[in-house]
């Protein structure tokens, strides 16, 4: 309703189509299919709210570096929080994605650290724990 819309962050928009596709893939089987759109709307509000708060801090403290620690999905592969901060005029945004490789097979390790064929790189840097993949071209 209109009253609730007033509570949304300024210039609110839903995440892009790739972000929605990843979200749908991740949520499939966890929530009813007919509810995925509503959950995605909530995810997008969350991302926009975090971006709005980050921008406020950066505007008040332009000489500072802001580190935001969020769940991986909000930052990996684009579409979430980093994109929303960039859309608001702040270009110096970097994503460090932390991945525990300890329990993964060699194929899982490689598919986790090399850029995804559809989504691209999971971040600007990937911080791994455990053993890196034996044949990773990005070591």
What are these regions (language model features)?
Residues 45, 49-60, 64-67, 73-139:
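C-terminal regions of proteins
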Residues 1-55:
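A substrate-binding/cap region within the structured catalytic cores of diverse enzymes
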